[in-house]
C-alpha cells in the first residue's frame, strides 16, 4: 500500500521521479518503518475515536495556525481540512489548487510563502 500511496500523493511526474525513489530508500533503510506504517493504518480509526475528547481542547488554542492542504488530496481531503479549521478557531485555511497529499512538493513556492508570512504568536491573524 505504501508504494501505491506515495506515487499517487505527488501530482507532478518530474517531482515524483525525483522524490519517490528517495522516499522508498528511506522507508526500506529504516527497519521499523514498515511495521509502524502498517500499524498506523490498522490503528488509525480506533486511535481517532479514542482521542475525540481532546478535540474540545483545540477550541482553546490561541496561537497562529495555518492549515495548508491540497484541494486534490483524495486522502486528507478538503473536508478534513475544513474540519481542522472548525476545530481551531482563528486558524487560517489554505486549499492549494491542484495540489495533492504532498502539497509542499506540488506547490513548494506557495507553501513556503504561507510559512514565511505566518503571523507571530500574539499578533492578530489575517
Enumerate the predicted regions with their spans.
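Acidic catalytic loop of the alpha/beta-hydrolase fold
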Residues: 46-48, 72-76, 101
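Short alpha-helix in the alpha/beta-hydrolase fold that links the catalytic acid
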Residues: 53-55, 63, 77-86
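Catalytic active-site module of serine/aspartate enzymes centered on a nucleophile-bearing elbow/loop
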Residues: 87-126
Amino acid at each position: 500500500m505504501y508504494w501505491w500511496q506515495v506515487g499517487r500523493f505527488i501530482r507532478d511526474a518530474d517531482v515524483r521521479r525525483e522524490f519517490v525513489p528517495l522516499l522508498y530508500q528511506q522507508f526500506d533503510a529504516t527497519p521499523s518503518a514498515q511495521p509502524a506504517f502498517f500499524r498506523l493504518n490498522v490503528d488509525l480509526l480506533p486511535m481517532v475515536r479514542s482521542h475525540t475528547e481532546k478535540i474540545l481542547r483545540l477550541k482553546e488554542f490561541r496561537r497562529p495556525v495555518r492549515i495548508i492542504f491540497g484541494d486534490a488530496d483524495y486522502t486528507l481531503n478538503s473536508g478534513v481540512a475544513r474540519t481542522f479549521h472548525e476545530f481551531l478557531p482563528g486558524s487560517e485555511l489554505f486549499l492549494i489548487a491542484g495540489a495533492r497529499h504532498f502539497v509542499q512538493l506540488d506547490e513548494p513556492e506557495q507553501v513556503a510563502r504561507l510559512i514565511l508570512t505566518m503571523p507571530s504568536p500574539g499578533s492578530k491573524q489575517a
